[in-house]
A protein has these predicted regions:
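Conserved catalytic or metal-liganding residues and their short signature motifs at active sites
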Residues: 3-222
Length: 222
């Protein structure tokens, strides 16, 4: 009787072992294929072809990734964004990162002479294109609500580096820049501008002109 049970148990144990190894390999075995400690995947929700091209560069097996991603309900719920993937992780962790690890970018710009130049500079660093950004920057309701116009709106964009999500909208980016502008003008800076007989926008505008002219001088042939 014991021998009969043993003969039945052995194949079951073997099958369970094979299934366990297969499960581990699919979900937890390292599926990354890059040298750096981490990479960033730029995902656009409805761009399936672009997504496949991206993961094929960085994953050892796209086949197992897609199987796990489907099981975990990711493929029908892709999110647009910039996602950090660490080296040495399996498909389970990769999918988790693609769900929850949208990582900001550092958007940097210096003084620009025209709103079009600024939009072009920013559009190279986030998903939105320059036309969408220009439209948001020149939105009539936005300008009216904040006492701005088409000529002075450029002054609210203070040259610096800013943490924003790669998939931020043009309106959200513009509103963040206005918030940063208002933060910049604390009580001390506001008082200094007042003492000089200048408005906040005039101070920023003058500083921008000085920097641009200085840059032009530096760029002249020696």
């Amino acid at each position: 009787q014991k021998m009969k049970v043993f003969k039945i148990a052995i194949p079951i144990i073997i099958i369970i072992s094979i299934l366990s190894v297969d499960y581990y390999n699919k979900y937890y075995k390292d599926n990354t294929d890059f040298e750096n400690e981490s990479i960033y995947l730029y995902v656009i929700k409805d761009d399936s072809l672009g997504f496949t091209d991206s993961i094929s560069k960085y994953f050892k097996s796209t086949k197992t990734f897609y199987k796990v991603a489907e099981k975990l309900g990711y493929l029908n719920n892709k999110k647009t964004g910039r996602f950090k993937i660490d080296k040495g992780v399996g498909n389970n962790e990769i999918v988790r990162s693609l769900k929850f690890n949208n990582t900001p970018v550092n958007v940097t710009f210096n003084n620009q002479e025209r709103i079009e130049n600024l939009a072009s500079r920013v559009s190279k660093q986030i998903l939105e294109d320059s036309l969408s950004l220009i439209k948001a920057f020149r939105n009539e309701d936005f300008l009216k609500e904040n006492g701005l116009n088409d000529k002075n709106v450029l002054s609210i964009f203070i040259p610096n580096s800013y943490n924003v999500y790669w998939n931020t909208t043009s309106d959200d980016f513009r509103d963040k820049m206005l918030t940063e502008y208002n933060k910049f003008w604390n009580q001390v800076r506001s008082k200094k501008a007042e003492n000089m007989g200048l408005s906040k926008l005039e101070v920023i505008s003058l500083a921008s002109i000085v920097q641009i002219e200085s840059r032009k001088i530096d760029e002249r042939p020696k």
